[in-house]
């Protein structure tokens, strides 16, 4: 593809930023990545789950094969409850068969290392560079760093995470150039109701590689994923006693993580596996507040946002990183389409603004669905109320064969990099489950739960109902 006279300045060198850099490189679009940290891939205890909707795009970029070598594909999941009952589900195997890609987990550090190592022009990734200001005019956009260096381009993309400086600068510019363009609720919309201890542990007897455990408790969820060599990636998610509004949210230390895990070390996760086993075998661990929000405004003038800076969700359904990859795919696809359809030369400010508008329009509905699915998942898995407790314990085990269908609809409607060849690796699920609806959250949960309770729980109690009699 012929080089075009356009440049993108990407702020943030994590999942969204590095994926976008790969996308732009493949399209011969000039760009630079500015990362505030001294190294691209620090080890902080985080892991990343790649589902088929993310894997397919990474395959297009020539990255997936390297990542897959580092993992053990999931094939079985166990769902456990505090009363000792548990059941197993072949959802991971079914997903692999349907889409041609397994669900995989690996160190976030290894994921970022791979993206960085496979990127061909390291001079375009500038580390140890903190952004101080973002400017946008009719002619260009500028990023000014704390040391006074200026980076100029046609578009600035904020891929700098939940605490995004680019988002704050975008708000400031919006308030200055077009008062009222940034709704006041945008600045107070992000909240915290859960904390999360996340870690990586050495192998634990009883936790088999290629399997996972979802342990649903009252006010707490423990998720474990067992990767290559039995390496255990885990999350301990706890409901907080109050709701916090960003930026006035809790900050946690490793000592806080130790205190929480020590208090619950004898809590059973599954069979004879306890929280203490995760803690005692830990290699690295961290604790954080889990911010949640779907921002309504993703762009202003020549500035656009992606990843956690616009849709921050809990890790319960494992789609945060995959959603960031989808953002990069859609943004770069629209950019390539704009440049090929309009010919060489720098696009006008108005054209850039239309591009960013189209980007949000293409992504928002799906991002909203995934955000609400994640939000629901956090509350469902922690048994947030009596209905969720009953449905989780007594209904879900009876409809386990449908769980893969719910996930399949989410996967099949995933994005793709439009200007790169579709992967040969595939499966029947992409076509079968595409545009089949997204189940939740558009069915009101109260109604959905009532139907499930009547259909599945009432018979267990030896009762009858008009709905059952009618069926």
Swiss-Prot record:
Its cofactor is FAD. FAD binds at residues 35, 49, 108, 308, 321. Its EC number is 1.-.-.-. Keywords: FAD, Flavoprotein, Membrane, Oxidoreductase, Transmembrane, Transmembrane helix. The chain crosses the membrane at residues 403-423, 443-463. It comes from the Eukaryota. GO terms for biological process: terpenoid biosynthetic process. InterPro entries: FAD-bd, FAD/NAD-bd_sf, FAD_mOase_fung. GO terms for molecular function: FAD binding; monooxygenase activity. It is found in: Membrane. One of its GO terms (cellular component) is membrane. It is a multi-pass membrane protein. The active site is at residue 216. Pfam families: FAD_binding_3. Pathway: Secondary metabolite biosynthesis; terpenoid biosynthesis. Belongs to the paxM FAD-dependent monooxygenase family. FAD-dependent monooxygenase; part of the gene cluster that mediates the biosynthesis of anditomin, a fungal meroterpenoid. The first step of the pathway is the synthesis of 3,5-dimethylorsellinic acid (DMOA) by the polyketide synthase andM. DMOA is then converted to the phthalide compound 5,7-dihydroxy-4,6-dimethylphthalide (DHDMP) by the cytochrome P450 monooxygenase andK, which is further prenylated by the prenyltransferase andD to yield farnesyl-DHDMP. Further epoxidation by the FAD-dependent monooxygenase andE leads to epoxyfarnesyl-DHDMP. This is FAD-dependent monooxygenase andE. It comes from Emericella variicolor (Aspergillus stellatus). The gene is andE.
